Curated annotation (Swiss-Prot):
Similarity comment: Belongs to the purine permeases (TC 2.A.7.14) family.
Gene Ontology cellular-component annotations: membrane
One GO BP: purine nucleobase transport
Keywords from the UniProt entry: Membrane, Transmembrane, Transmembrane helix, Transport
Organism ancestry: Eukaryota, Viridiplantae, Streptophyta, Embryophyta, Tracheophyta
Record Pfam families: PUNUT
Tissue/organ expression: Restricted to pollen.
Span of domain EamA: 45-152
Native species: Arabidopsis thaliana (Mouse-ear cress)
Region (Disordered): 329-351
Protein name: Purine permease 3
Transmembrane parts of this sequence: 4-24, 35-55, 72-92, 108-128, 132-152, 168-188, 207-227, 249-269, 274-294, 304-324
Membrane topology: Multi-pass membrane protein
InterPro entries per UniProt: PUP_plant
Length: 351
């Protein structure tokens, strides 16, 4: 069951992680200028979470005895408060990321976000006491080096219509977004550990629902202050792809981004925050390739090398996990054999 959850969450995360930045950049490339609106779209798809929650509720209700009450939500106040806090932080982090995408090519933004893995490793070590293995360290180093290699000659990717100041500002703000999200992932894992209730995937979905609701509220407040509600009808009419496609892009953006967040927190539940971070980093070079295909961004040799290093890091990490699992099973078998031998030898010694 755990392996199935890991695979499902990896697929969902891959769709969101690769598709989210591309469709967000599509909005900005075709006349979109509202950063808070783009921020809102990152979490606005949260109502789709009610669908699996409804199935979970129906299943629990059928399994209960007749007359027993079944609550739709399982989350308790302690985990609820944690979800609210993480949701507010995510709202501001999403704004930082949207600001960066507004002024940077997808390839450059992907490179910066890849650097968050090093920060995730540090925060995970201090916040959730995540132990490092040689394979984990090797994966972190390879993925970080891959991100650094990807950074070579990024200045040539600067959009023509943007100033150097806008480019640098977008670069620095995206770095801040990477660091902040690197803090959020272990914070979610810590919330799971301190929940004082048995974590299930239903609880993970409820946590995600509240997180996205609060992040969306932060975005709506930002949209109101920035005047986005007044500006959006005009922006839709002037959208280069047409008014109808403006709303299509908005809807698909909300749905695809929801996949990213669901996959990320689902991996934290079934594995750890570090694994979630490694998976995000592995997918970034794939986003690079898609950006080259759809937006005709340059694919220098550095990007090819970065892709190879990232895949190497991915393989290194999972090989280490497989080896670690085999070692644990071997130790458990040896301990069980020793226990059996000691129990058999005890009557002889007593005689």
């Amino acid at each position: 069951m755990v392996k199935a959850l890991v695979i499902i969450n990896c697929i969902i995360l891959a769709i969101g992680n690769c598709g989210g930045p591309l469709i967000m950049r599509l909005y900005f490339n075709n006349g979109g200028k509202r950063i808070w609106f783009s921020t809102f779209l990152e979490t606005a798809g949260f109502p789709v979470i009610f669908i699996p929650l409804l199935f979970s509720y129906i299943t629990r209700r059928r399994s209960n005895n007749v007359g027993d009450s079944t609550s739709f939500f399982l989350i308790k106040p302690r985990l609820l408060i944690a979800a609210v806090i993480v949701g507010i932080l995510s709202g501001f982090d999403n704004y930082l990321y949207a600001y960066g995408i507004a002024y940077l090519p997808v390839s450059t933004a992907a490179l910066i976000i890849a650097s968050q893995l090093a920060f995730i490793a540090i925060f995970s070590f201090f916040m959730v006491k995540h132990k490092f293995t040689p394979f984990t360290i090797n994966a972190v180093v390879l993925l970080t080096v891959g991100a650094a290699v990807l950074g070579m000659h990024t200045e040539t990717d600067k959009p023509v219509h943007e100033t150097h100041k806008q480019y640098i500002t977008g670069f620095l703000i995206t770095v801040a977004a990477a660091v902040m999200y690197a803090f959020i992932l272990p914070l979610v894992e810590l919330a799971y550990q301190k929940a004082k209730q048995t974590m299930s995937y239903t609880l993970v979905l409820e946590f995600q629902l509240i997180l996205c609701l609060l992040a969306s509220i932060v975005s709506v407040i930002g949209m109101f202050i920035a005047g986005d509600f007044k500006a959006l009808p005009k922006e839709a009419r002037e959208f280069k792809l047409g008014e109808a496609l403006f709303y299509v892009v908005a809807v698909f953006s909300a749905i695809i981004w929801q996949g990213f967040f669901l996959g990320a927190i689902g991996l934290i539940f079934s594995t750890s925050s570090l694994v979630s971070g490694i998976m995000i980093s592995v997918l970034l070079p794939i986003t690079e390739v898609l950006a080259v295909i759809f937006y005709h961004e340059k694919f220098q040799a550095e990007k090819g090398l970065s892709l190879a290093l990232s895949l190497w890091g991915f393989v290194s990490y999972f090989y280490g996990e497989i080896k670690s699992g085999e070692d644990k099973r071997r130790i458990q078998q040896e301990e069980s054999q020793e226990t059996e031998q000691s129990s058999l030898s005890r009557p002889i010694s007593e005689c």
